[in-house]
């Protein structure tokens, strides 16, 4: 499995990358591999405020469906609309084209409370 060291991870298998004062979020390589071929992604609404740990969306595969959780609290500022037509971007490039949404966190320091790649992998 590929879990880049520059990212942070939630125990619910989301990853976070800081870009300026925003965070970019998707699901980990481990999560997409466990789900199998994705066929549908429900993204959060732009402008919606989410609390850490609450449901932010859903990914569906040929095997099952799984909730996407907000890794930190904040407001959604952009979603990856390309996933509507190509949910398999998450399977092919979970940390690239497969990002799910961007958020303005209430407190960017909350990202520091998430797991490093080594701690995330140790919990798998």
From Swiss-Prot:
GO terms for cellular component: cytosol; glycine cleavage complex. Coiled coil: none annotated. The keyword Transmembrane helix does not apply. The modification N6-lipoyllysine is found at residue 63. Residues 22-104 form the Lipoyl-binding domain. Binds 1 lipoyl cofactor covalently. Its cofactor is (R)-lipoate. HAMAP family: GcvH. The glycine cleavage system catalyzes the degradation of glycine. The H protein shuttles the methylamine group of glycine from the P protein to the T protein. This is Glycine cleavage system H protein. It comes from Acinetobacter baylyi (strain ATCC 33305 / BD413 / ADP1).
């Amino acid at each position: 499995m590929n879990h880049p060291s520059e990212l942070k991870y939630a125990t619910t298998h989301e990853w976070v990358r800081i870009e300026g004062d925003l965070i970019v979020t998707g699901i980990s390589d481990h999560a997409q591999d466990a789900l199998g071929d994705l066929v549908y992604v429900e993204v959060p609404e732009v402008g919606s405020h989410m609390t850490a740990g609450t449901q932010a969306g859903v990914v569906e595969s040929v095997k099952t469906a799984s909730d996407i959780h907000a890794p930190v609290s904040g407001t959604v500022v952009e979603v990856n609309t390309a996933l509507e037509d190509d949910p398999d971007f998450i399977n092919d490039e979970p940390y690239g084209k497969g990002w799910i949404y961007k958020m303005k966190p209430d407190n960017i320091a909350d990202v520091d409370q998430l797991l490093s790649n080594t701690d995330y992998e140790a919990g798998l």
